[in-house]
């Protein structure tokens, strides 16, 4: 990520680097589209914005991204076109689409293969749109048995701001949130993967959202 940002900024022309936008376009994205994105901050939300605001540099920025094994062509803020799963089936999609119809999502798994806390796929992300002002129930249920026991925690975000979180101990997690219309991101992790240092633990669960 550091090299992509620097190569977008600098004047040097190197292998895979023909971009020289300077600081202003980067600053504009960081204080504008990136600051207000409904997605969580990532290379995808940043690159999608800087490409959109500097269309003449789109191809050259894609080349930079490709050199780092990131799919640039067609990129959106959610990384929907990404195909690099770092060799692990529990990485993609980065965001799973879900609707507030009470139907459980497909199974997703929180892993600590790449270490704990905020490392790759410790948190799994969902995105959904609230179409009306209402109370919504979020329910995460574990789908397997591991030691230590799976303990899903839920965080709800709007435009990068934490709206609410549910972190009681147990194999399932449920909470109600009053939401206004808009796009939301839900981050779910197995608590064991946030806090413990042993690798290769996996906690799998489904999520459902119900409008009350």
Task: List PLM regions with ranges.
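Solvent-exposed serine/threonine-rich low-complexity stretches and specific carbohydrate-binding patches
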Residues: 163-171
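Non-catalytic extracellular/lumenal accessory regions of secreted precursors
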Residues: 53-135, 141-145, 168-169, 210-212
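Intrinsically disordered, low-complexity coil segments
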Residues: 15, 144-147
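Extracellular attachment fibers and their assembly/anchoring modules
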Residues: 138-140, 151-153
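C-terminal edge strands of extracellular/lumenal beta-sandwich accessory domains
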Residues: 124-127, 146, 153-163, 177-212
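Short, surface-exposed coil-to-beta transition loops
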Residues: 149-151, 172-173
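Active-site-proximal alpha-helical
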Residues: 1-56
């Amino acid at each position: 990520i550091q090299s992509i940002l620097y190569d977008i900024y600098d004047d040097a022309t190197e292998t895979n680097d023909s971009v020289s936008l300077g600081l202003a376009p980067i600053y504009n994205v960081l204080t504008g589209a990136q600051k207000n994105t409904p997605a969580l901050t990532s290379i995808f939300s940043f690159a999608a914005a800087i490409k959109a605001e500097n269309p003449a540099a789109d191809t050259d920025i894609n080349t930079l991204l490709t050199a780092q094994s990131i799919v640039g062509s067609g990129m959106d803020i959610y990384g929907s076109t990404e195909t690099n799963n770092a060799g692990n089936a529990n990485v993609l999609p980065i965001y799973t689409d879900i609707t507030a119809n009470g139907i459980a999502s497909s199974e997703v798994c929180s892993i600590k293969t790449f270490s704990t806390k905020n490392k790759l796929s410790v948190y799994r992300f969902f995105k959904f749109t609230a179409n009306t002002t209402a109370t919504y129930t979020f329910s995460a249920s574990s789908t397997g048995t591991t030691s230590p026991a799976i303990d899903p925690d839920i965080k709800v975000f709007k435009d990068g701001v934490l709206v609410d979180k549910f972190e009681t101990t147990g194999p399932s997690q449920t909470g109600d949130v009053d939401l206004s219309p808009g796009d939301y991101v839900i981050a779910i992790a197995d608590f064991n993967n946030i806090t413990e240092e042993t690798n290769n633990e996996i906690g799998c669960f489904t999520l459902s959202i119900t409008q009350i």
